[in-house]
Amino acid sequence: ETVRTVVDGENVEAGGFARIKTVIDEKKEENPDTLVVDGGDFSMGTLFQTVYEEEASELRMLGYLGYDATTFGNHEFDYRSKGLAQMLDTAAASGDVVPSLLVCNVDWSEMNDERQLLKDAFDHYGVKDYEVIEKGGVKIALLGVFGKDSLSCAPTCALEFKDPIEAVKETVATIKEKEDVDMIVCLSHSGTSEDPKKSEDELLAKAVPELDVIISGHTHTTLEEPIIQGNTAIVSAGEYGINVGSMHLSQNAEGRWEVEDYNLIPIRPDIEADEAAQEKIDAFEANIDDTYLKQ
């Protein structure tokens, strides 16, 4: 769905998966090897959450839009362990293309019934610490991490998590040891803050300098320019799908990646909605009408 929001003091209609599909397709037409990722919190905030468990509409739409990967945000746990597990099982069984789900800091060392339910669903879906994707001859390691503040905002989450920085360090070390990659990108549902002590993704970049890019979620921060910490670029396109971030990187003489171009594309009514994507959205919406709104 689109949202009503205030931008520069003006009420505007923004966002919407059908418009985002148009933008992604245009970017992929320019460069078929475009990597498309998300920083988590993909599943709550509209009426579509009412069919979260039965339809897994958000993950299925992300797959249709062309997203390669995402991670978990705190709102993925809003329907508790049973709801999240059922949603993952539904998405996995749908037969649709769905994005990879990545998170490296779940602690499975102590199990109970709820955690086992989630572990089984994670395995069914194929949730991983990291994966390697090749785009245009560039091998990219993608990993996901769930931040400390995210956990504090997820009171219904039954999982335990390792320290985000330590888990990312361990995962990057594993990637360096086992994989031959050119770039490492972290999908972090941790966020940034004006308070340096609370800016989790800036602290992560300082602690793990091997990261080339951090896709920063959770704090709804709109970064008009990347935060550059050492050799790591931290980027965030804001909230509610009202922008799509676009970034082009180039490799320097030392083999590190530098931001050559970065911009936020506002998702507004002047962008034509993709018809096929809108038809899929309408079908999910019709199910919501029949199941909940017409009773």
PLM segments and residue spans:
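Acidic, metal/ion-coordinating pockets
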Residues: 1-270
